[in-house]
Curated annotation (Swiss-Prot):
Protein name from the UniProt record: Tuftelin-interacting protein 11
Family matches, as Pfam families: G-patch, GCFC, TIP_N
Bias type Basic and acidic residues, positions: 1-13, 53-64, 103-116, 217-231
Biased amino acid composition, Acidic residues: 91-102
Family affiliation: Belongs to the TFP11/STIP family.
Organism domain of life: Eukaryota
Location(s) in or outside the cell: Cytoplasm; Nucleus
Molecular function terms, GO-annotated: nucleic acid binding
Role description: Involved in pre-mRNA splicing, specifically in spliceosome disassembly during late-stage splicing events. Intron turnover seems to proceed through reactions in two lariat-intron associated complexes termed Intron Large (IL) and Intron Small (IS). In cooperation with DHX15 seems to mediate the transition of the U2, U5 and U6 snRNP-containing IL complex to the snRNP-free IS complex leading to efficient debranching and turnover of excised introns. May play a role in the differentiation of ameloblasts and odontoblasts or in the forming of the enamel extracellular matrix.
Record-level GO BP terms: biomineral tissue development; spliceosomal complex disassembly
Residue segments, region Required for interaction with DHX15: 1-50
Primary localisation category: cytoplasm
Motif placement: Nuclear localization signal: 700-705
Length: 837
């Protein structure tokens, strides 16, 4: 079998020039077409065998048709290659170099208009392959098939208004003739022979050349008049900077002009040139000239950078470029500097405008102040003129008050800023002294209160309303009260008798809301208290007919804790007076009873235990219990002090001096054939002598229950029980009744407490305003009959002071504080009630 088919070329011819043979190895083409059943057998050409994948392939060989192997089309026209002169190698190389570069386009190269282009087909395509599937080859005989039909299409068009020979559409705007085709003269490219537009397209779509487009194209061609000597045909690119860009760059570079201290001291070694150079900052590198080294030979400087031939250097002048760049930089800096100067001037204009507005406002304000001060000066001069002794129309206190009211209403700022102290001293003080010259505070305590209240609102400094001490140099009203009003009070207090306290108390009550707090404190501490202290020292409870509480207690609302130093000598004098006292004398109770709510609970209880309880115990020890002839005077003397001494002290007296003798008499009586009815009456009679509060005490209950047990044991024994029928039942009934009464009393107490709680709850629910802590204290004070009222003109750290019985308190954020010896101590509500009792 011949293997000559392996040596055929791409067209099936046998290559006689070469004896090479095809290898039987598997190629890449075999791998790619391994699973392609319709692949065309490709005969390897000599060029493919030589160059492999770098071989140039014919387009006819590497692009098979869709119909399998395509037969040669002998009906296609013959393509001739025009003969000509073969270009030289230099020109071919130049063309190859210029293929990848941009080709300049001239204005004359563009056609004026473009017509429809005929699709150029190769000679290898058959005429049958130029149409689409299902289409026709030509549109010349469009609609000719209606000769063989009934012409339904033409009829439908005519029914819809179509007129033969005219265009389609409502207004016959459609084309009448089909699109014309124009045959190109030769086989050149599109536009090679001029415009290819038909007469019909020129009529339907006229084209008017735009002058702007023509001018733009002309400018493009004009900029390309110079040819780059290097052979590059690229269009040079120019960059333009606007003034806004320069301004923005100047604002940014302004922050970066000052180099960093660290970078400005860095040592830099430049080894890019022939010699090593040392720079001491990065900024010096930017001033380095980009010039070739002089030491290099000319041939080495002109060596090409690549494998291609070295191109000739362009026309360049480094000095001219440097000068131009320097001019550009100077111009940019000048623009930036002018922009900064302009911005500075604008800011200066705005600043001066604001300063002008401020100065205008200040000027207007100063003019108003000058005008107001002139008016104030006129009024002051008028007052000064009328204050002269020889004036026919002297100034009165009421007229002076009206002048000051005018100053306060119309010229408030000037009035507040002026020195009111000096003005009041010069004008008001003489008039005020004349007004109070004939005043007697104890006879007419309300004299001058209205006029002083008016001057308080005119002269008092608002900043000193809460001032605790005296500041006469800053407040005109305080100085007025201290220098004009206080001398009259001092004179009257020196003549006042403390036992006649009502006029003085009424006088201070009338002025407590008007005078400053520190002046009231001065009156009470320096004038009133020494007089009271001296009078207490001279008081003798045995000889004085006027009780001491009658002239001490009226001072409690005003002085309160200030009277504490007087209580100790009062208790001492009362103790001395009670040394020889007997409980049969009831005058002691009348003297001591008003002091029960004044002394503290501890001091009162200690006073009672020391001076009263021993006397009562001695009296109760002398009591003789005789069922047949009982004397009750001593018992009444003791029980009469039940409200004065505590229940525990009274129960202690009964346990020690009464119940032992009482139980002993009961046992003796039961052992001598008693009459149990009489014993029952005797038992119930003694029990009725005690109050419910004493009977509710556990110790007293135990003693009476012990008596019932003794009676039950006596009835249960055989001795004497037969002598009185029904005695056992009577004693049992009595025991049951007493126990039931005790139970009912306890239940009633619990029910009362529950009812009180329910009533308080209903009251709170019915009230629209919720109860606060102050209302709760007020409710507790009402329940325990304790006086709860605010202290007039007294505050502590801005909080209102109250009297709770004899205790001074104040409330701060739901906590009650009680005044101690040196400080205020917080306490609970129950402790407060116990202290007040």
């Amino acid at each position: 079998m011949s293997l000559s088919h392996l040596y055929r070329d791409g067209e099936g011819r046998i290559d006689d020039d070469d004896d090479e043979r095809e290898n039987f190895e598997i190629t890449d083409w075999d791998l790619q077409n391994e699973f392609n059943p319709n692949r065309q057998r490709h005969w390897q050409t000599k060029e493919e065998a030589t160059y492999g994948v770098w071989a140039e392939r014919d387009s006819d060989d590497e692009r098979p048709s869709f119909g399998g192997k395509r037969a040669r089309d002998y009906s296609a026209p013959v393509n001739f290659i025009s003969a000509g002169l073969k270009k030289g190698a230099a020109e071919e190389a130049e063309l190859e170099d210029s293929d990848d570069e941009e080709k300049p386009v001239k204005q004359d190269d563009f056609p004026k208009d473009f017509g429809p282009r005929k699709l150029k087909t190769g000679g290898n395509f058959k005429p049958s392959q130029k149409g689409f599937a299902g289409g026709t080859k030509s549109f010349m005989d469009f609609g000719s098939w209606e000769r063989h039909t009934k012409g339904i299409g033409q009829k439908l068009l005519q029914k819809m208004g179509y007129v033969p020979g005219r265009g389609l559409g409502k207004n016959a705007q459609g084309i009448i003739n089909p699109i014309e085709a124009k045959q190109r003269k030769g086989k050149g490219a599109v536009g090679a022979y001029g415009s290819e537009r038909t007469t019909q397209s020129m009529q339907d779509f006229p084209v008017v050349d735009s002058e702007e487009e023509a001018e733009e194209e002309f400018q493009k061609e004009l900029s390309q008049w110079r040819k780059d000597p290097s052979g590059s045909k690229k269009k040079p690119k120019y960059s333009y900077k606007t003034v806004e860009e320069l301004k923005a760059k100047g604002r940014i570079s302004k922050k970066l002009t000052a180099p960093q201290k660290e970078l400005s001291q860095v040592k830099v070694i430049d080894m890019t040139g022939r010699e090593q150079k040392v720079y001491y900052s990065y900024s010096q590198i930017s001033h380095k000239h980009n010039v070739p080294d002089d030491g290099l030979p000319l041939q080495s400087q002109q060596l090409p950078q690549s494998g291609k031939e070295a191109k000739a250097p362009g026309f360049a002048l480094s000095e001219l470029e440097h000068n131009l760049q320097l001019l550009i930089d100077l111009t940019e800096q000048e623009i930036i500097q002018n922009d900064r100067q302009l911005q500075y001037e604008r800011d200066m204009v705005v600043n001066l405008f604001h300063e002008l507005e401020k100065m205008t406002e200040v000027l207007d304000h100063e003019e108003r102040v000058i005008f107001n001060l002139s008016k104030v000066l006129e009024m002051v001069e008028e007052c000064e003129r009328r204050m002269q002794p020889n004036c026919s129309n002297p100034l009165t206190l009421d007229e002076c008050a009206r002048i000051f009211e005018t100053l306060q209403d119309k010229y408030y700022e000037e009035y507040r800023m002026s020195d009111r102290v000096d003005l009041a001293v010069a004008i008001v003080y003489p008039l005020m002294k004349e007004y109070f010259k004939e005043w007697d505070p104890l006879k007419d305590c309300t004299y001058g209160t209205e006029i002083i209240s008016k001057w308080k609102s005119l002269l008092e400094n608002d900043q000193l309303l809460s001032h605790g001490g005296q500041d006469l140099s800053a407040d005109a009203f305080h100085r007025l009260i201290w220098e004009v009003w206080m001398p009259f009070v001092r004179n009257i207090v020196t003549q006042w008798q403390p036992r006649n306290c009502d006029p003085m108390v009424d006088f201070l009550d009338s002025w407590v809301h008007i005078i400053p707090v520190w002046i009231l404190d001065n009156i009470l501490d320096q004038l009133i208290f020494p007089k009271l202290q001296k009078e207490v020292e001279n008081w003798n409870p045995l000889t004085d007919t006027v009780p001491i509480h009658s002239w001490i207690h009226p001072w409690l609302p005003l002085m309160q804790a200030r009277l504490e130093p007087l209580y100790s000598p009062i208790r001492s004098k009362l103790s001395s007076a009670l040394q020889k006292w007997h409980p049969s004398d009831s005058s002691a109770k009348l003297i001591l009873q008003p002091w029960k709510d004044v002394f503290t609970p501890g001091s009162w209880e200690a006073f009672m235990v020391k001076n009263i309880v021993p006397k009562l115990g001695m009296c109760l020890g002398e009591l003789v219990i005789n069922p047949h002839q009982q004397h009750m005077d001593a018992f009444y003397w003791v029980i009469d002090w039940e409200g004065m001494i505590s229940v525990s002290s009274l129960v202690g007296l009964l346990e020690k001096h009464f119940f032992p003798k009482w139980l002993q008499v009961l046992c003796s009586w039961l052992s001598n054939s008693p009459n149990y009815e009489e014993i029952t009456k005797w038992y119930l009679g003694w029990k009725s002598m005690f109050s419910d509060q004493v009977l509710a005490h556990p110790s007293v209950k135990d003693k009476f229950n012990e008596a019932l047990d003794i009676m039950n044991r006596a009835v249960s024994s055989n001795v004497g029980a037969y002598m009185q029928p029904g005695a056992r039942e009577n004693i049992a009934y009595l025991t049951h009744t007493e126990r039931r009464k005790d139970f009912q009393y306890e239940a009633m107490q619990e029910r009362r407490e529950a009812e009180n709680m329910a009533q308080r709850g209903i009251g709170v629910a019915a009230s629209s305003v919720p109860m606060n802590f102050k209302d709760l204290i007020e409710t507790k004070a009402e329940e325990h009959n304790i006086v709860f009222m605010p202290v007039i003109g007294k505050r502590h750290e801005g909080k209102q002071l109250y009297t709770f019985g004899r205790i001074v308190i104040y409330i701060d954020r739901g906590v009650v504080f009680v005044q101690g010896e040196k400080t205020w101590v917080p306490t609970s509500l129950q402790s407060l009630i116990d202290m007040a009792k």
